[in-house]
Every structure is written in structure tokens, then in C-alpha cells.
Amino acid sequence: MERKFSDQELIRRTHLQELKNQNKNPFLITKVDRSMFLKDFAEKYKNFSKEELHNMDLEKLTLAGRLIGIRQTFGIIQDFSAKLQIYINKKNVAPEVFSTFKSLDIGDIIELEGVAMKTNSDEITLNVTNIRLVAKSLKVLPEKYHGLVDEEIKARQRYLDLIVNDETKNTFIKRSLIIREMRNWLDNKGFFEVETPVLQDILSGAAARPFITHHNTLNKEYYLRIATEIALKKCIIGGFEKVYEIGRIFRNEGMDSTHNPEFTSVELYIAYVDLWYIMQLTEDLIRHIATKLNLLNPTFRGFSIDLNKPFKKAHMVDLINEYVGVNFFEVKSDEQAIELAKKHHVKLLDHQKNFGHIVNAFFETFVEEKLVEPTFVYGHPLQVSPLTKKNQSDPRFVDRFELFICQKEFANAYSEINDPIDQYERFIAQLEEAKLGNDEASELDMEFIEALEYGMPPTGGLGIGVDRLVMLLTSNDSIRNVLLFPHMKDKTK
């Protein structure tokens, strides 16, 4: 396939060919012996004056980075740690060194040898004595003052976004620190980290449409996991009393500002605790991460949030009553619930024409958008919670909560079903829903039922969407901005 290049790209390719003709092909270089990172260089010499540096017998150091700016005999290079000014004096270097400097293009990756100096403006600078080109940039970086602002290009060409936008790089540094702090906190609380299969032969653990793949050797269809829940509960059954997994989840569903087909979640399970214990743990975990990284006051979706304030708690039915004026505690039949849905113009699919789904539909239609401050919503209906213990006071509901912040769900937690008979009946009910068109219904997982029959202690479980938490803490409104390489529609579509 013939490729077309811009005039600038052709000039750069000509420069590369000239280097090859001189036996200076930069792509043959395999190693650079750096003395230190740019940030460390600046830190080492920042407290010396211009005169002190000039009069000191300084050691020559080797630095490396990408050239991102040139102005006469000055330049700017950057590595992962920082940016640094460089300076070359034609009178003090060999002619071929100065010639190499003048032939460089913005974006080139270079090795530099030199000593520290300060300019009249007191800026730490590398006084260059030698230069070697170690990778030629054949593409032109975005122009300095306008930068890279097109969100589509930033997501498709994240490597370019990272080169030119410090804000993007800092977001992904924070993402790494958030996950690290989450892991450290759980480890320090005595949790045991495990890894469970991505390929699963039963669809369960969440309400979601799966990706399906084929195992050639076994000649068998598998799902990419939609949750880690079932496998982690098996660990609890096996005797691990505090387990967690941070890993990729795959759901074959729509894409929008808060959803990507593959995403990262943390799920954890603790034996001998209930929903209320998990609720406090969730608040403690999020606040700890935000405090540790100084991210307690993010702005998300146009709302300013204070994560240091106690999180609110409310029953789902009470919230519906508050915002809609309908008290579902007083509704005694599916027929009554259906009439209320008609009255309030709540659309229902065939499998949703029952009390539980209608309560949930009211909540999603009228209440979610009202929940700005961090709020634990508990008391979900039984029909939408097939893996959750029934509430002992009102078995139409279950011991489950979701955490909402700025109108979006961030966490989902249960007192887990440990009664294998109840769990079997719930799976059968899910099969009936599937017949009515619910393509997110769970399958009958007999292996899990048999595992439960050996006995699982009372258990509390929690799932948190890591990407969405990163969005909140870094004040990013789009999930694409916190995923290094998000899924995108084809350019031609």
C-alpha cells in the first residue's frame, strides 16, 4: 500500500536517509547510559547560584529525552519526570556536535552530555558538550501554542496526547497511584489478592450482555467475564475469609461518557460481615484514597464534591416517595405497580412487569439524577438482585446498596446469598426472565449451587468501578480520558 507524506514528513525522512548514509542510523542504537532523570538533575543543582555553578568543577552527566522545543542555541527536552532547558555554545563544542544540534527536528529523541549551568533568568540548564540522536521522529508534533485539543485524536492517538499534554500524563499517573493505594489499603486490612478466570462457561455474577468467544481445543463457547463475583465467592467457600481482585471486566453493551466495553473493577468479599459493615468499609476506602492523594474535593459532571463529609444513606423506596410521591411500601401487588407505572409514564419491557422491576424503573427514571452528594441507596427489590440475601423485615427487598455520586453509580454491594436452595430458585427465576426477553439475565450455574451446598458463611461483598472512581478523583467527565486506549468507533463509520 502506497503511503502519502506531508512536505515536513518527507524532509524528516530525507534527514534520516542522510544519517544512514553517514553510518549514523539512530535506530541501530540499543542503549543509553543515563546518569539520572531530568527532574533529579534539576533538583541536584537548583540551590546553586549561576556564579557558583560557573566556578565549580562539575562532572559531565548524560541525560536523555525528547526534544520538544528549539530556539536558536537553546532547546527544551522532556522525559517522564520533567522538562529541562538545554544550551549549546558553538564556540565550545566540536563542529560536528553543533551540526548535529542544528539538524535536529522537534520530536527527536536525543542523548546529551554536559554540565549544569544557570541562565540570567536563574533557570537550571544543561550546557551541552555532546549530542547523539537515538531515535528520529518522522512525524510532526502538534504546534506548541495550540497543542492537541481534539478529544477524538487524543483518545485514538494517546501516545501523542501523552507527549504534548502534561495534564493527560498526570491523569494516568494519578490512576496508577489510586489503584496502588487501593491495593495497599486492602492488603493492610488483611485481604488476600487472587486471580480468577477471564474465560467462563456460565453467564452469571451481574446483569449484563457478554462477549462470546470459542475455545478451539475444547470446541466450546466461552464468555469473557462480566464479573468476578462467583469465583471470589468460591474462594470464600474454600476458606479464604477476605479476598479481592482488581481486574478487567467485559460487557458487550453501549459506549458513552461513563461506559466502555472493557473496564477495571475491584471486587472484594469478607466472611462473617453484613451489608452495613461493607457500607462503612466502602466509605473508608474511598476517603482513604482521596485523602492520601490529596483529592478530597473533586469536580465531576459540573458538581463540586467534598469526600470528607459523611456519606448519606437512604432506602430506595423512601427516595422514590420523596421525589415522586409514590410509596412502594404500600403497594401490595404487581397489578398495582403496573398501574402506577402507566400513571407516571414509566416504560416497561415484558420482563419488567412486576413489582421489583417497576420499583427499580421508578428509581432510575426519577431519582438517580437527583443524587449528587455521595449517597448509599439500599433496599433494592428482590427481582433485580438475584445474588443478594432477602431482607428479613420485608422479603420483597434485599440487603443491597449502591453508592451514587454526581448522579452516577460507583459501587454495588450485598449481603450475599449463602442459602443454596434460595440461590437455585433465584437462578430459575432468571431463566424465566430470559424467556421474556431479558438478555441480561443470569444463567443457571449449577457448579456454584453445588459449591454453596458445602456451606458458605454469611458474607458481605462489594464491587467498585475503578475507572469511574478515577474519573471522579481526577475530575474527568469522560471515561475515555482515564483509559489509556479506549475503544472507539471506526473512523469511517
Swiss-Prot record:
Gene3D superfamilies the UniProt entry points to: Bira Bifunctional Protein, Domain 2, Nucleic acid-binding proteins
Compartment(s) where it occurs, according to its Swiss-Prot or TrEMBL record: Cytoplasm
Tagged with keyword Protein transport: no
InterPro entries registered for this protein in UniProt: Aa-tRNA-synt_II, aa-tRNA-synth_II, aa-tRNA-synth_II/BPL/LPL, Lys-tRNA-ligase_II, Lys-tRNA-ligase_II_N, Lys-tRNA-synth_II_C, NA-bd_OB-fold, NA-bd_OB_tRNA
Residues that coordinate or bind Mg(2+) 2: E409
Binding annotation for Mg(2+) 1: E402, E409
A GO term from the CC aspect: cytosol
GO molecular function: ATP binding; lysine-tRNA ligase activity; magnesium ion binding; tRNA binding
Family per record: Belongs to the class-II aminoacyl-tRNA synthetase family.
Protein name from the UniProt record: Lysine--tRNA ligase
Organism of origin: Ureaplasma parvum serovar 3 (strain ATCC 700970)
Phylogenetic lineage: Bacteria, Bacillati, Mycoplasmatota, Mycoplasmoidales, Mycoplasmoidaceae
